[in-house]
């Protein structure tokens, strides 16, 4: 039984040489966020009183990227093994709390498995997460006597008989702070690697008569670490497959689960259909009967009931009411809002603008910093000229306005209800209700005109 108080140590000091990258290994993204963030999130969900993050290589970048004031940063200046890393964190351990040891490059460890490990830890003993492998080569072996764990021996230090053992150490364990500090102080580096192994505390605990309980993870992928990009990509696919399966079982129709990426959180209604190669980032909310076409990217957006997003459309920080249609090849940038029944067609970009109920922008337009009323038609090629090189200005368009093709609205400008803007017009002054505005150069016809001929 674990103590009521629990803190977590996350080892994240490694350079990750085999990643061949300037980025610290634990900052490489999995499902849209750094590997180590997955581990931090798990620790927080467990209710850890403190999270101690042991860092070394790329420490400043780690601090800048994670920017979490609740983390306690512990420097491991030299990487001399897992035991040495824990020794750096040991001064922060309270005697009466449990200490759970995790790894920043083992990102898929589940809260459920960790809760079982904490619950299984004997009073005053150690809880150890282990797995059995068909090919345990390279891993530390769990040594038992009469069924009881008595030690862990690393592969390089193991005898031939010990190498036949198929139960291996995952590195994840929990022990109480008082005993753990004492055992850490007794570690030495008299081994093939010349490092301080955290695994040596198992033999020390056994010598003290402490019980050591083992727990297996629900899935092997939970304890798989990342040392190179191949392993990272494999875990990415494992994670995405799991997310896709959960969505399918919850009623979301993924037309090809192997070509769907969830890099955040998806909240959804009923009868959702998502085509291939769709990417979900941040927190996305989909209402009932929403249809998402192939190749779309949705980030931090809300899409109302019965709306359809056609292929290759990008939505970021946008909000759509019910029965909206967007795309194909449209882009809604932060602050874009579509009222019920609004339509945005191909190659239309909307930024920090609201399109009113039933309004349409069908083709090739830019609408930025604008408030557009209900029942408005935005003709092809319309641009709200919102920026003078220094400041942004707003365009306001009332209800039932017809804006002809190739119109430029030079903000700040207001077009009142019912107005009509002729094609090719540049609007520089406010337009009153029900006015027709046209600004064009007089059309000239020259008979018999001959185009210039290139000199040979």
UniProtKB/Swiss-Prot annotation:
One of its GO terms (biological process) is UDP-N-acetylglucosamine biosynthetic process. Catalyzes the last two sequential reactions in the de novo biosynthetic pathway for UDP-N-acetylglucosamine (UDP-GlcNAc). The C-terminal domain catalyzes the transfer of acetyl group from acetyl coenzyme A to glucosamine-1-phosphate (GlcN-1-P) to produce N-acetylglucosamine-1-phosphate (GlcNAc-1-P), which is converted into UDP-GlcNAc by the transfer of uridine 5-monophosphate (from uridine 5-triphosphate), a reaction catalyzed by the N-terminal domain. It comes from Yersinia pestis (strain Pestoides F). GO terms for cellular component: cytoplasm; membrane. In the N-terminal section; belongs to the N-acetylglucosamine-1-phosphate uridyltransferase family. Acetyl-CoA binds at residues 380, 386-387, 405, 423, 440. Binds 1 Mg(2+) ion per subunit. Signal peptide: none annotated. Its cofactor is Mg(2+). SUPFAM superfamilies: Nucleotide-diphospho-sugar transferases, Trimeric LpxA-like enzymes. The active site is at residue 363. Gene3D superfamilies: Hexapeptide repeat proteins, Spore Coat Polysaccharide Biosynthesis Protein SpsA, Chain A. Residues 1-229 are annotated as: Pyrophosphorylase. Its EC number is 2.7.7.23, 2.3.1.157. This is Bifunctional protein GlmU. Pathway: Nucleotide-sugar biosynthesis; UDP-N-acetyl-alpha-D-glucosamine biosynthesis; N-acetyl-alpha-D-glucosamine 1-phosphate from alpha-D-glucosamine 6-phosphate (route II): step 2/2; Nucleotide-sugar biosynthesis; UDP-N-acetyl-alpha-D-glucosamine biosynthesis; UDP-N-acetyl-alpha-D-glucosamine from N-acetyl-alpha-D-glucosamine 1-phosphate: step 1/1; Bacterial outer membrane biogenesis; LPS lipid A biosynthesis. Residues 230-250 are annotated as: Linker. CDD domains: GT2_GlmU_N_bac, LbH_GlmU_C.
């Amino acid at each position: 039984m674990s103590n009521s108080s629990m803190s977590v140590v996350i080892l994240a000091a490694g350079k990750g040489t085999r990643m061949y990258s300037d980025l610290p290994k634990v900052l490489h993204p999995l499902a849209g966020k750094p590997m180590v963030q997955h581990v931090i999130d798990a620790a927080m969900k467990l209710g850890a009183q403190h999270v101690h993050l042991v860092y070394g290589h790329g420490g400043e970048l780690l601090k800048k990227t994670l920017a979490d004031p609740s983390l306690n940063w512990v420097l491991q200046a030299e990487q001399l093994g897992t035991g040495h890393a824990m020794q750096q964190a040991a001064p922060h351990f309270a005697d009466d709390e449990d200490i759970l040891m995790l790894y920043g490059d083992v990102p898929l460890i589940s809260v459920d498995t960790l809760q079982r490990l904490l619950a299984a830890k004997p009073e005053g003993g150690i809880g150890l997460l282990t797995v059995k492998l068909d090919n345990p080569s390279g891993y530390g072996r769990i040594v038992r006597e009469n069924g009881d764990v008595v030690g862990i021996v690393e592969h390089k230090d193991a005898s031939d008989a010990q190498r036949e053992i198929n139960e291996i150490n995952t590195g994840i364990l929990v022990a109480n702070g008082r005993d753990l500090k004492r055992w850490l102080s007794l570690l030495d580096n008299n081994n093939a690697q010349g490092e301080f192994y955290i695994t040596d505390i198992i033999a020390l605990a056994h010598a003290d008569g402490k019980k050591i309980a083992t727990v297996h993870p629900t899935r092997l992928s939970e304890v798989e670490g990342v040392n190179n990009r191949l392993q990272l990509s494999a875990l990415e696919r494992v994670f995405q497959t799991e997310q896709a399966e959960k969505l399918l079982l919850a009623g979301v129709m993924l037309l090809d689960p192997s070509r769907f990426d969830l890099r955040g959180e998806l909240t959804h209604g009923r009868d959702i259909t998502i085509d291939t190669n769709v990417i979900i980032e941040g927190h996305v909310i989909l209402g009932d009967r929403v249809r998402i076409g192939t190749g779309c990217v949705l980030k931090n957006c809300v899409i109302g009931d019965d709306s359809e997003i056609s292929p290759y459309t990008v939505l970021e920080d946008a909000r759509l009411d019910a029965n909206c249609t967007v795309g194909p090849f449209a882009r809604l940038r932060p602050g874009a809002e579509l009222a019920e029944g609004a339509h945005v067609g191909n190659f239309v970009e909307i930024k920090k603008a609201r399109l009113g109920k039933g309004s349409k922008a069908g083709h090739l337009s830019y609408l930025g910093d604008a408030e557009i009323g209900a029942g408005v038609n935005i003709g092809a090629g319309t641009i709200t000229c919102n920026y003078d090189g220094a400041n942004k200005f707003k365009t306001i368009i009332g209800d039932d306005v017809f804006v002809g093709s190739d119109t430029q609205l030079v903000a700040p400008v207001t077009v009142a209800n019912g107005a009509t803007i002729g094609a090719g017009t540049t609007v520089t002054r406010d337009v009153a209700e029900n006015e027709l505005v046209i600004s064009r150069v007089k059309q000239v016809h020259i008979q018999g005109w001959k185009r210039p001929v290139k000199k040979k």
